[in-house]
A protein has these predicted regions:
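Pro/Thr/Ser/Gly-rich low-complexity, intrinsically disordered linker/stalk tracts
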Residues: 1-30, 68, 83-100
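Extracellular beta-strand-rich solenoid/capping regions of secreted or surface-exposed proteins
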Residues: 18, 139-154, 164-217
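Extracellular low-complexity, O-glycosylation-prone stalks/linkers
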Residues: 28-52
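Right-handed parallel beta-helix/beta-solenoid
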Residues: 43-52, 88-121
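Beta-strand-rich modules
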Residues: 62-86
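Short glycine/acidic-rich loop motifs that flank beta-strands on beta-rich extracellular proteins
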Residues: 83-84, 143-144, 166-171, 189-197, ...
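N-terminal extracellular ligand-recognition/capping segment immediately after the signal peptide
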Residues: 108-153, 158-170
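Right-handed parallel beta-helix
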Residues: 178-190, 216-231, 243-262, 268-275
Length: 275
């Protein structure tokens, strides 16, 4: 009886544009081919087949289309070869792969703003994207303004079980470098701040261009979020600094507005792209 390819020998890599996953595995001598399946395992209890299930491959590689921020698992099983009286492998090798950005820190619960005060971004991470995970289904609050300044930060919940965030008082997220909030349910009923998202009142001097604007070249965005009870602005540049924002985005979001004022307000700034 043959064995399936060893998981340690399987290589998985993204195409340059990130749209396809290329999976290669070592040859199993005497094999009559391989059975390949790729699963989306964001919800491990309910895997979703990507492409052809149990595709028979006469070779040692397979390609599947993939998406960002997704967990996958490849299953590869060696098939038998009657010519050599080799029987197929009884089980498949299972190899996990994720297109999620690596986690730098995890907040288990509680006040996100207080946690960030107690756990500042490490000096060796300044200038790099810093990803903070929230635990799926857990409840959090933001009790004060969080100004990330010139640090590019992503706060990320779970795609299949959103983190629950309650914005309280002067709570808001400000940045001059780019900020993403992903996969969270955000309740703004108790938020008194002028905006949920905004630009920092202290710009990054190195980002200033000849026109006098300060360029925010990385996205400011919500992705996969449900925002409820929003009685203030969704985005506001705080009317302090003249920014040029390359991209302001709201991807796969539901936003409940409880006001008829301007939702996105760039008083001094310009926004190149918004969707």
């Amino acid at each position: 009886t043959l064995e399936s390819p060893e998981a340690a020998g399987v290589e998985m890599s993204l195409s340059p544009d990130g749209s396809r996953l290329v999976v290669t595995w070592p040859v199993v001598k005497g094999a009559g081919g391989y059975e390949f399946t790729l699963y989306n395992v964001d919800d491990f209890e309910k895997p979703i087949v990507i492409g052809v299930e149990k595709e028979v491959i006469d070779g040692c590689s397979a390609v599947r289309e993939v998406e960002a921020d997704t967990k996958y698992m490849a299953a590869i099983r060696t098939l038998g070869n009657e010519q050599y009286n080799n029987k197929e492998a009884q089980t498949a090798s299972e190899i996990p792969y994720s297109t999620l950005a690596p986690t730098d820190a995890t907040i288990e619960s509680g006040d996100i703003s207080a946690w960030l005060v107690a756990n500042p971004i490490p000096a060796d991470k300044i200038g790099q994207e810093y990803t903070i995970d929230l635990v799926g289904g857990r409840e959090y609050i933001v009790s004060d303004v969080i100004d990330f300044g010139n640090q590019q930060v992503t706060i990320r919940g779970s795609k299949v079980n959103h983190a629950k965030i309650k914005m309280v008082g002067n709570a808001s997220f400000l940045t001059n470098k780019g900020f993403k909030l992903k996969f969270a349910d955000v309740d703004c009923a108790e938020m008194t701040a002028a905006t949920l998202l905004g630009t920092s009142t202290t710009p990054d001097a190195s980002s200033q261009v000849a026109s006098g604007e300060y360029v925010v070249s990385t996205p400011i965005m919500l992705q996969g979020c449900n925002v409820t009870n929003l009685g203030k602005k969704l985005f506001y540049d705080m009317n302090k600094v003249k920014y040029c924002i390359d991209y302001l985005g709201f991807d796969d979001c539901n936003i409940q507005m409880l006001q008829s004022d301007v939702l996105v307000h760039a008083a001094k700034s310009s926004i190149i792209r918004m969707d």
